[in-house]
């Protein structure tokens, strides 16, 4: 992180190509397509394949980079990155953690993936060199590895490097976790690190912070921190590259930190003012149209010449201003001439098509090579519309404007439209559900209203709530509280309402009255509210619970569940149950004189049952 030592060494530095150990090395990504690494004039990439330096087969760590690394850790470690106490670094491993015994070194590397263990002349050693070049860029620390920096920018770079080293840089240590301690939690995965396990400790993160060896990775790229060198910032560990990007923007062209007061920003990335140019021809793109490909800007001419798609219909380039259709790696111009059936040339824009062996067809008949036939009633009916407006956007799907067509379908309907004519009435067209047809709602089915007769007047329209209407509608209402006639409301408290009441007097003269009233109650529960007029019968009056006579001037309400049982209300095993004292009142002469049913002023009992022999009552009773 320090500047180079003397001005004389800096001025007498040879060109980068003469001392670059990566020059001529093959590219690991392009293989034989790249003739060898050749550093670009100001980009940190190869001039041939456009790949970065670390993608090429660099066999050894550059000397300058190793010196920079030594200075980076000079305040933390007195030895170099290859010094250790194991004695096996030069024999088996290209690098080992310092201060470990041989058995501890094996224990540490056993926690890492096999392809990342830095054995000598192994993929792990190549991985280490690649990560050194990527995670610790030399141009982030010293100005001599940068291009065209102003004096003010060089001062800012030196101050930037010293600040990072002073506040963020650190090198982790590896040691066995003490057995006497109960254990710790890994800062990355959150799992337990037990006593006797190998652990990585970072002093910048605090005394208790530790990681599993395989968990000590950069927060941004999730790669192992090479040689345990880390930068601690805001409670997280970073590699050198991504920590610098947390503080300053990085130019996407030259890969250097931007210290100039002005820069270009596009699509969340940054460039130096003079570096925002075409990736191929390096023409300036300031105020020009460009295409971003793999985070690299291209001018329109270079993009069409190098990366534009070829049309599978005509074989020509698909321009940037031309719409295109794409399907599973195939591309067509968004025109009727190119995107059409390969046999009958029927336009397919906005219509379904059948791909077969790299070609597209309008129907199965065309795909099989037979003559096309007109669509029948059971076939797909294909629209004959055409595209009337040109498409100017390059997207995968288009909404084409279709002309007049006899069918309203776009190839998705498999049945012809019904012929025009008088509509046949359907049984289900007006089949809106009624309340009486929904037993799941807890409602009873309403019977059909009886035929009107001179002696039975028609019911009121509001009384029949379940009757059919001319325009049925679905109407969900709460279930009715009472299924019978008007509900009788008692003024007594609920506890008193549940007590049995005294029965009415059972006289032969009342049998006909009671039988008629029971039948009328059934009609009321079925929704029929006809008033039966019988000559010689007394009118029905409301029962008064306050009469309290033992002869039974009051009966149970119509909603009582025991109104139709074999046992009379107020009787148990044939014996009358007396009323409680608070419901009884002294009988007067007037009350006694009104207990006979021959008096026209006496209200009739609302509901009672005919007199039954005691033997019958005894047989049908149920002892609770």
UniProtKB/Swiss-Prot annotation:
Keywords: Cell membrane, Cilium biogenesis/degradation, Cytoplasm, Developmental protein, LIM domain, Membrane, Metal-binding, Mitochondrion, Phosphoprotein, Repeat, Zinc. Residues 1-26, 371-617 are annotated as: Disordered. CDD domains: LIM1_Prickle, LIM2_Prickle, LIM3_Prickle, PET_Prickle. Disruption phenotype: Prickle3 knockdown results in reduced respiratory complex V activity, altered complex V assembly, and abnormal mitochondrial morphology observed in the retina. Mutant mice exhibit degeneration of retinal ganglion cells, fewer retinal neurofilaments than wild-type mice, abnormalities of the retinal vasculature, and significantly reduced retinal function. It is found in: Cytoplasm; Cell membrane; Mitochondrion. Residues 587-601 have a biased composition (Polar residues). Widely expressed. GO terms for cellular component: mitochondrion; plasma membrane. It is a peripheral membrane protein. Residues 1-12, 509-541 have a biased composition (Basic residues). Residues 74-182 form the PET domain. Its main location: cytoplasm. Coiled coil: none annotated. GO terms for molecular function: zinc ion binding. The modification Phosphoserine is found at residues 475, 491. It comes from the Eukaryota. Residues 447-458 have a biased composition (Pro residues). Belongs to the prickle / espinas / testin family. Interacts with VANGL2 via its C-terminus. The VANGL2-dependent membrane recruitment of PRICKLE3 is a prerequisite for its polarization. Interacts with WTIP. WTIP is involved in the recruitment of PRICKLE3 to the basal body. Interacts with MT-ATP8, a component of the mitochondrial complex V. This is Prickle planar cell polarity protein 3. The lineage of its organism: Eukaryota, Metazoa, Chordata, Craniata, Vertebrata.
């Amino acid at each position: 992180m320090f500047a180079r030592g003397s001005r004389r060494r800096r001025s007498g530095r040879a060109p980068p190509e003469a001392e670059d150990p990566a020059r001529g090395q093959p590219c690991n990504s392009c293989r034989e397509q790249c003739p060898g690494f050749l550093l670009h004039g100001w980009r940190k990439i190869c001039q041939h394949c456009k790949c970065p330096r670390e993608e090429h087969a660099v066999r050894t760590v550059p000397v300058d980079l190793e010196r920079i690394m030594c200075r980076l850790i000079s305040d933390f470690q007195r030895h170099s990155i290859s010094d250790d106490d194991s004695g096996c670094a030069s024999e088996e491993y290209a690098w080992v953690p310092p201060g470990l015994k041989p058995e501890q070194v094996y224990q540490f590397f056993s926690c890492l993936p096999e392809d990342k263990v830095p054995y000598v002349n192994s993929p792990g050693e190549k991985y280490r060199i690649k990560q050194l070049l990527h995670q610790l860029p030399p141009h982030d620390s010293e100005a001599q590895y940068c291009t065209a920096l102003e004096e003010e920018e060089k001062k800012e770079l030196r101050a930037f490097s010293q600040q990072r080293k002073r506040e963020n840089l650190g090198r982790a240590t590896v040691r066995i976790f003490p057995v006497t301690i109960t254990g710790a939690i890994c800062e990355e995965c959150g799992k337990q690190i037990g006593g006797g396990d190998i652990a990585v400790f970072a002093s910048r993160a605090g005394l208790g912070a530790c990681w599993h060896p395989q968990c000590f990775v950069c927060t941004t790229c999730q790669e192992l921190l090479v040689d345990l060198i880390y930068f601690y910032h805001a409670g997280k560990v970073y590699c050198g590259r991504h920590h610098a990007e947390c503080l300053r923007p990085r130019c996407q062209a030259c890969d250097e930190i931007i210290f100039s007061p002005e820069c270009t920003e596009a699509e969340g990335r940054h460039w130096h003012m003079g570096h925002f140019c075409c990736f191929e021809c390096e023409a300036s793109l300031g105020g020009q149209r460009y295409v971003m490909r793999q985070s690299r800007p291209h001018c329109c001419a270079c993009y069409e010449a190098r990366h534009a798609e070829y049309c599978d219909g005509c074989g020509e380039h698909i321009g940037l201003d031309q719409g295109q259709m794409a399907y599973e790696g195939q591309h067509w111009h968004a025109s009727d001439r190119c995107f059409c059936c390969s046999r009958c040339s029927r336009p397919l824009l906005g219509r379904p098509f059948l791909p077969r062996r790299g070609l597209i067809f309008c129907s199965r008949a065309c795909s099989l090579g037979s003559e096309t036939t007109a669509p029948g009633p059971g076939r797909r009916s294909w629209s004959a519309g055409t595209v009337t407006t040109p498409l100017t956007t390059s997207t995968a799907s288009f909404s084409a404007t279709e002309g007049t067509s006899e069918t309203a379908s776009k190839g998705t309907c498999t049945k012809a439209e019904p012929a025009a004519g008088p509509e046949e009435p359907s049984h289900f067209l007006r089949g809106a559900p009624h309340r009486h047809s929904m037993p799941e709602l807890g409602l009873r089915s309403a019977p059909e209203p009886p035929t009107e007769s001179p002696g039975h007047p028609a019911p009121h329209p509001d009384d029949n709530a379940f009757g059919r209407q001319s325009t049925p509608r679905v109407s969900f209402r709460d279930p009715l509280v009472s299924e019978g006639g008007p509900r009788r409301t008692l003024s007594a408290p609920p506890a008193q309402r549940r007590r049995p009441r005294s029965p009415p007097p059972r006289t032969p003269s009342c049998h006909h009255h009671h039988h008629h009233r029971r039948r009328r109650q059934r009609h009321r529960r079925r929704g029929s509210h006809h008033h039966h007029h019988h000559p010689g019968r007394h009118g029905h009056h409301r029962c008064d619970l306050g009469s309290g006579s033992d002869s039974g001037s009051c009966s149970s309400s119509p909603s009582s569940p025991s109104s139709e049982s074999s046992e009379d209300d107020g009787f148990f095993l044939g014996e009358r149950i007396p009323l409680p004292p608070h419901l009884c009142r002294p009988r007067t002469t007037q009350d006694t004189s009104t207990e006979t049913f021959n008096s026209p002023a006496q209200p009739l009992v609302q509901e009672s049952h005919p007199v039954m022999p005691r033997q019958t009552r005894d047989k049908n009773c149920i002892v609770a």
